[in-house]
Curated annotation (Swiss-Prot):
The glycine cleavage system is composed of four proteins: P, T, L and H. It comes from the Bacteria. It comes from Serratia proteamaculans (strain 568). NCBIfam families: gcvP (TIGR00461), PRK04366.1 (NF003346). The glycine cleavage system catalyzes the degradation of glycine. The P protein binds the alpha-amino group of glycine through its pyridoxal phosphate cofactor; CO(2) is released and the remaining methylamine moiety is then transferred to the lipoamide cofactor of the H protein. This is Glycine dehydrogenase (decarboxylating). The keyword Transcription regulation does not apply. The gene is gcvP. The lineage of its organism: Bacteria, Pseudomonadati, Pseudomonadota, Gammaproteobacteria, Enterobacterales. The modification N6-(pyridoxal phosphate)lysine is found at residue 708.
Length: 959
């Protein structure tokens, strides 16, 4: 054997696992596109003046086991204290059946947002269950399928209140003084960009004020007190002031629904329903409102509709409210929500059912009552007379109490003047309460749990009788049927089978980068060292997180060419918002607050104008030329017209048209010449990493979609992470946090997310990816992604024109197939092709974005030549089918394209089509061996929006 030990150790092994095609297959792909090597292909495609002389120095590759061992050593530096801090975060007991069959299951976590409902019925049903839980617990009419976190939901509630307000001159938003501080922080950030005045005071003080358009209350208050807001809500309604209540989802199991008390909007975090704290996230927020506000509601709504055969089917309803259609006029900027986390919470409710939830909530409340009674018996005073799970305990020597708590391995809430806060949770046991007695009342406290239980069970008044829930919850059969693990496992598998995820086939969605989410990358997110930490624990207890985040940040600095990275934004859209706020605050620091114009090319993703609007900027559209590139003349004219009002440009690179624009540096120079900043959208970073960087190109700030480029899975529509990279002059202006000090950030910068580091517990995924790939592997990933896109474009260009190409007729990492000529000639649309692909076993490419009547294909580096060929064969076969329609062999109203997708039930019913059953479901030979069967036919979108219904339907509807 002539190999060296170094070669046998094979530290680059993961690169071959991540990149789908072998070296031999890559050579075949290169021959097909007419390039000698990967480097030669890149030289043909990427402008020479932006190519890096060497890959960014992020180190060599490591094997999966080496990287896991390194990260485990880092994670072990985190100290797992018992955290009773509360403030919207609680320890949970995730049911193992959900952990194994959903959170650790690629059939759930690798799926995309359910824009194609025919291949998404399983997770749509789980999300509908989530909405039903929300409606039952809040007492309102309409619920969304999750928002990013509770604080973001509060900001959205404020925006809704203003949109819906009939008090057009009112400009003040009132926040009760017992709302969580991080929620207030995010509300203030959003209010500042909209020019709203935020007033914080005791709830009843709002009645003394004028010019208020909305009010935010909290149930349970941040220090534990319960409030009967019925009278206040009624009076505010009389005054036409919008009302929102931030609610604890577990408390709502026992308490009267705020909607029944008169609230217009109720929202909160669903974290307590089975999702670990994870040092701040990811967690799904729930959001509900009255029916009259449905057109103003933020976020996605799952609605009950019907398919082409008249059968009940689910879809995302009223999508015309979303930013990809309405752009800067959108209700919200919901590009990534928290589907995976919402579905965990949904299935937690299904598994426990109403009785199980009442038992859990009842146990938490009983233990809190016992703790309260014991502390009072020991001579300690409580600040409030009512509570669900949180006590504020008056202490004389607070510092001594907190020091003693740490010696017990316990974290208490520290920021209440003259007192400590204690929040109990699902994981709290009677032994934990005994430990708290010893901590606060001394080792010889003499308190007996059973005796205290007997006393409080008879005469507890901590929840006033008038605030106890009287109505039943979760009466639908889905919440009363799956309580054995066997039934629950089968229910989850039944849902999973309805969906198409990466474990079934390539998902070639343009602008989405659906690459491999490797098992080794996913393993650390469930380690208790990462999953159990409270986001507001003492920083020394999170030393492992600090090291991991620090290393990841430094790698991202190298890979982007920026000087600093902020990890707080918990979605790409939030990253855009945070980056634009940094630009805004930078201009303000230079006494140039008049710079408010944001230039955006006409090809931009809808999140760009929506983010600009959220950041308080005015959007001016820059034209593109016939080749899809930014029109430099128009850019120069618009920049000059804006003059001292020019704030920035938002540009995507490679462009949203799938091309490396040759003039990108000139674009940056023009904007800088007129005093603006350059925001380079990181959506297409998978075509930059290792080849160029935004900083090298000339940009000032970018967000990175870690759920695209850096392997965090899409989760069926979230979680995501959108950290921003910035040049040094913008670094002081990235988001801060009112509870946790973030190094290097000016303290006056507000937060954009509830937790200081966003969805911190999924950052290990990106850490693992970069560590295992190394500098050369990351560059190779970008090169192969570009190669794969050019292979598809080359093979399909004669059947489907490629709309935009760059030098030498090359594309970047994605290509746009123009269906418009075919539609004009034959009547077959991009929608028909997308739905027919389901019969061939594929998720559709991105439809009608960024150009109507097109399909945008992004294959990613993780797909093998075998899978690329399978997709190409499907597209060519579909083109042959279109030709048969054009020749008149099949009528336009009855052919396998317009009738797609086809379901099993059709095969055993009367068949009266002009084509065979076999052609319908097994159109080419390769489909037979791994057939995906959709559970519904094509959805009736018009019916779904005209008949909006967004909670569970009777089980008979599915029969």
């Amino acid at each position: 054997m002539t190999q060296t030990l170094s070669q046998l150790e094979h530290s680059e092994a993961f690169i071959e696992r991540h990149i789908g095609s072998s070296a031999q297959q890559q050579q075949q792909l290169l021959e097909a596109v007419g390039a000698r090597s990967l480097n030669a292909l890149i030289q043909q495609i990427v402008p020479a003046d932006i190519q890096l002389p060497a890959p960014p120095p992020v180190g060599d590759a490591a094997t999966e086991h080496q990287a896991l061992a390194e990260l485990k050593a880092i994670a072990s530096q985190n100290q797992r204290y018992k955290s009773y801090i509360g403030m919207g975060y609680s320890a949970v007991l995730t049911p193992p059946v959900i952990l194994r069959n959903m959170l650790e299951n690629p059939g759930w976590y690798t799926a995309y947002t359910p824009y194609q409902p025919e291949v998404s019925q399983g997770r749509l049903e789980a999300l509908l269950n989530f909405q039903t839980v929300t409606l039952d617990l809040t007492g309102l009419d309409l619920a969304s399928a999750s928002l990013l976190d509770e604080a973001t939901a509060a900001a959205e509630a404020m925006a809704l209140a203003k949109r819906a307000s009939k008090l057009k001159d009112a400009n003040r938003f009132f926040v009760a003084d017992d709302v969580h501080p991080q929620t207030l922080d995010v509300v203030r950030t959003r209010a500042a960009t909209f020019g709203f005045e935020v007033i914080v005071d005791k709830a009843e003080k709002v009645l003394e004020l004028q010019g208020v358009f909305g009010v935010l209350l909290q149930q349970v208050g941040t220090t534990g007190e319960l409030h009967d807001y019925s009278a206040l809500l009624a009076e505010l309604k009389n005054r036409k002031i919008g009302t929102s209540v931030a609610a604890d989802i577990m408390a709502l199991v026992l308490l009267t629904a705020p909607g029944k008390q008169g609230a217009d909007v109720v929202f909160g975090s669903a974290q307590r329903f089975g999702v670990p704290m994870g040092y701040g996230g990811p967690h799904a927020a729930f959001f509900a409102c009255r029916d009259e506000f449905k057109r103003s509601m933020p976020g996605r709504i799952i609605g009950v509709s019907r398919d082409a055969a008249g059968n009940t089917a689910l879809r995302m309803a009223m999508q015309t409210r979303e930013q990809h259609i309405r752009r800067e006029k959108a209700n919200s900027n919901i590009c990534t929500s928290q589907v995976l986390l919402a579905n965990i919470a949904s299935l937690y409710a299904v598994y426990h059912g109403p009785q199980g939830l009442q038992r859990i909530a009842g146990r938490i409340h009983r233990l809190t009552d016992i703790l309260a009674a014991g502390l009072q018996q020991a001579g300690l005073q409580l600040r409030h007379k009512t509570w669900f799970d949180t006590l504020t305990v008056e202490v004389k020597d607070k510092a001594a109490v907190l020091e003693r708590a740490l010696s017990f391995g316990i974290n208490l809430r520290t920021d209440i003047h003259g007192a400590v806060g204690i929040t109990l949770d699902e994981a709290t046991s009677r032994e934990d309460v005994q430990t708290l007695f010893a901590l606060l009342a001394g080792d010889n406290h003499g308190l007996d749990i059973d005796a205290l239980d007997a006393a409080v069970s008879k005469n507890s008044q901590s929840i006033p009788a008038g605030m106890l829930r009287k109505d039943p919850i979760l009466t639908h059969p889905v919440f009363n049927s799956y309580h054995s693990e066997t039934e629950m496992m089968r229910y989850m598998h039944r849902l999973e089978r309805k969906d198409l995820a990466l474990n079934q086939a390539m998902i070639p969605l343009g602008s989405c980068t659906m690459k491999l989410n490797a098992a080794a990358e996913m393993i650390p997110i469930t380690w208790p060292e990462f999953s159990e930490l409270h986001p507001f624990c003492p920083p020394e207890q999170a030393a492992g997180y600090k090291q991991m985040i620090g290393q990841l940040s430094q790698w991202l600095v190298q890979l982007t060419g920026y000087d600093a990275v902020c990890m707080q934004p918990n979605s790409g859209a939030q990253g855009e918002y945070a980056g634009l706020l940094a630009i805004r605050h930078y201009h303000e620091s230079r006494n140039e607050s008049g710079r408010h114009i944001c230039l955006i090319p006409s090809s931009a993703h809808g999140t760009n104008p929506a983010s600009a609007q959220m950041a308080g900027m005015s959007v001016v559209v820059v034209a593109c030329d016939k080749n899809g590139n930014i029109d430099l003349h128009d850019l120069r004219v618009k920049a000059e017209q804006a003059g001292e009002e020019l704030s920035c440009i938002m540009v995507t690179y490679p462009s949203t048209h799938g091309v490396y624009e040759e003039t990108i540096r000139e674009v940056c120079q023009i904007v800088h010449q007129f005093g603006g900043q350059v925001y380079l959208d990181g959506a297409n970073m998978n075509a930059q990493v290792g080849i160029t960087t935004p900083g090298y190109i000339g940009a000032d700030v970018s967000h990175l979609n870690l759920h695209k480029t850096f392997c965090i899975p899409h989760g069926g529509g979230g979680p995501g992470m959108g950290p921003i990279g910035v040049k040094a002059h913008l670094a002081p202006f990235v988001p801060g946090h009112s509870v946790v000090q973030i190094d290097g950030v000016l303290t006056q910068q507000g937060a954009v997310s509830a937790a200081p580091f966003g969805s911190a517990s999924i950052l290990p995924i990106s850490w693992m990816y970069i560590r295992m790939m190394g500098a050369e592997g990351l560059k190779q990933a970008s090169q192969v992604a570009i190669l794969n896109a050019n292979y598809i474009a080359t093979r399909l260009k004669d059947a489907y024109p490629v709309l935009y190409t760059g030098r030498d007729h090359r594309v970047a990492h994605e290509c746009i197939l123009d269906i418009r000529p075919l539609k004009e000639e034959t009547g077959i649309s991009e929608m028909d092709i997308a739905k027919r692909l389901i019969d061939y076993g594929f998720h559709a490419p991105t439809m009608s974005f960024p150009v109507a009547g097109t399909l945008m294909v992004e294959p990613t580096e993780s797909e093998s030549k075998v899978e690329l060929d399978r997709f190409i064969d499907a597209m060519l076969a579909i083109r042959s089918e279109i030709d048969r329609v054009a020749k008149g062999e099949w009528p336009l109203e009855d052919n396998p394209l317009v009738n797609a997708p086809h379901i099993q039930a059709e095969l055993v019913s009367d068949w009266q089509h002009a084509y065979s059953r076999e052609l319908a479901v097994f159109p080419i030979a390769g489909v037979r061996e791994n057939k995906y069967w959709p559970s519904v036919k094509r959805l009736d979108d018009v019916y779904g929006d005209r008949n909006l219904f967004c909670s569970c339907v009777p089980m008979s509807e599915y029969e």
